[in-house]
A protein has these predicted regions:
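Alpha-helical transmembrane signal-anchor helices
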Residues: 1-30
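C-terminal catalytic subdomain
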Residues: 5, 9-12, 203-215, 220-282
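Charged alpha-helical signal-transmission linkers that cap and connect PAS-family sensory domains
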Residues: 24, 105-106, 110, 223-224
Length: 282
């Protein structure tokens, strides 16, 4: 009987040890999960703030500047996007740009912010688009050990004459909507970042009053549906041709293209930033 009692006491003690260990393990796991939850909330909050700051750098929505009407949208695939666009008027000229950084998320967003600030810094002392893009490329090449790059379209429109000088660095050629739809002729310059001292060509076109410039990133043409088919340039042009026939204003053009993309992609996950900018020359 004494032996049995000892055995039972040992078993009971072992049970208490097991219960105590489980309680300790559960408590430690709960603390770890709480810490992870707190860290996740902090990261989410930081990303939200970064996204708000990023969007504040761009002229989202509808604007009218000296009779020039513009409308732009940016829908990032993640909290922070790698696309950029901007436009402003100074000394009778309309400066415009749109770009797409390779990659997504925070790294792409940081490069986008750097490129955005440098573009306008260079514009203070220079109006030639090719020279601005060349200077931007040389700056981007410094200490670029990761070989990060981005595409960019940069244009300067003389509001008095309608003459637009522009330089395209590997970006999707814009469209001109007037009495017909035309893809802007763009030389195949390389993107910004990989090669220092690269040459970028200057091009020129004269726009007629009432023309609309439609700029976009490849998040439009490469938008996938649930069957992994791309929206593509043909669908893009078909929608824009309809906009020409209906003589739509910048906001209506962007909204029409956006609706067409959403209808095409349905419930497919967005894989890339979607950015569009339409500017109507008075």
């Amino acid at each position: 009987m004494l032996v049995l009692s000892c055995i039972l006491n040992v078993i009971a003690g072992a049970g208490l040890l097991i219960l105590g260990y489980k309680h300790y393990r559960n408590t430690r796991e709960l603390k770890r999960l709480r810490k992870l939850s707190s860290e996740k909330k902090r990261i989410t909050s930081d990303l939200l703030l970064a996204s708000q700051i990023q969007k504040s750098m761009m002229p989202l929505g509808h604007r009218i500047l000296d009779g020039v009407e513009g409308y732009g949208t940016l829908v990032p695939a993640r909290e922070i996007g790698g696309d950029l666009f901007d436009y402003a008027i100074r000394d009778g000229k309309l400066y415009m740009c749109i770009g797409d950084v390779c990659g997504k998320g925070a790294p792409a967003g940081m490069l986008m912010a750097y490129a955005h600030s440098m573009i306008w810094s260079l514009t203070i002392s220079e109006t030639n688009p090719a020279r601005i893009v060349t200077s931007l490329n040389n700056l981007a090449c410094k200490d670029n050990v990761s070989c990060t790059f981005f595409t960019l379209f940069y244009g300067v429109l003389d509001l008095a004459t309608g003459c637009m000088q522009y330089c395209n660095a590997g970006h999707n050629p814009p469209y001109i909507l007037s009495d017909k739809l035309t893809m802007l002729d763009c030389d195949p310059n390389q993107p910004i970042g990989p090669v220092e001292d690269a040459e970028f060509t200057l091009q020129e076109i004269t726009l007629s009053p009432g023309s609309t410039i439609f700029l976009y990133t490849d998040g439009l043409t490469e938008a996938n549906n649930t069957e992994e088919r791309e929206f593509g340039p043909e669908r893009t042009e078909k929608v824009l041709e309809d906009c020409v026939k209906r003589q739509l204003k910048p906001k209506d053009i962007v909204d029409t293209v956006t609706a067409a993309v959403h209808h095409f992609t349905e419930h497919a996950e967005q894989s890339d930033d979607l950015t569009m900018l339409a500017i109507r020359y008075r």
